[in-house]
């Protein structure tokens, strides 16, 4: 399957975790109040970061077609998911955007 080849070629799991680590460092420095609300009194060493899903997406914006790969990590604490990180990659493995949200 082409998606599986793409995932192997770009090592999407490692790439997504690396991007998450960079994102979270910036988030903590640039948005300390928001960071504190999301992570509250959680012991950071006990947070499980789980590779949750990856998908090939085709979106239509007016008449334009936009194809990309979405990779998601789920953050769990005491077995419960509390946040999600999503990275968007173009078809050449370049990071286009990323999102972090509380769930």
Task: Describe the function of each predicted region.
Residues 42-87:
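Exposed beta-strand-loop-beta-strand "reactive/processing" segments of non-cytosolic proteins
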Residues 16, 71-73, 93:
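Generic structural hydrophobic/aromatic packing signal, biased to beta-strands
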